[in-house]
Amino acid sequence: MPILQWCPTGHFTFLPIHAAGNYDDQAVECAADYFISSYTPTVGALLAHPLAAASSSRAFKMMVVVQTKELPSAKTELEKIQRHIPSDALVVFGVPGAVANVETVASCLSEASIVHFACHGTQDRLKPLNSGLKLDDGLLRISRIMKEKTLDGSLAFCCACETAMGDEKLPDEAMSLGASLLFSGFQSVIATMW
């Protein structure tokens, strides 16, 4: 199935274009019947990542950050990941014995091929650089992520609220946690619009 990259602007940024279709009582026909939708914050983000070749030559490492106390389903996510990823390639924060603190998680971002966040997220519409992911000792802010030098992982998966939300008053601004991870070097990012 072909992949269609959407780069919406203005108020179209807030529309779930991937769900467009004819939803009448007779039959359902929708965009997903014809192609897989993917979103990009800018056309420039579609260009090949210059460090893509370098990241493929290093050993695979997955970092998982969870909040199992506040989000019970995060434990299930972690268990499913642990079934598929060898323990020597997995770094887990947010569980007993491995506190998810801001500085440790931020410094490990550059070593990760894939990161999976299953925690709370928050967007600061007035100061977007203060948006971030809630960890054990505070917020991993966009401004802190941007300080890391060589983020070249293949995927950042953000199972957290408000990680791809925009500001309705500034619809052409691409400042969200998901977009920031992409701009900081991750080749692909999955983030939430809720």
Model-identified regions with their sequence ranges:
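Catalytic cores of enzymes
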Residues: M1-W194
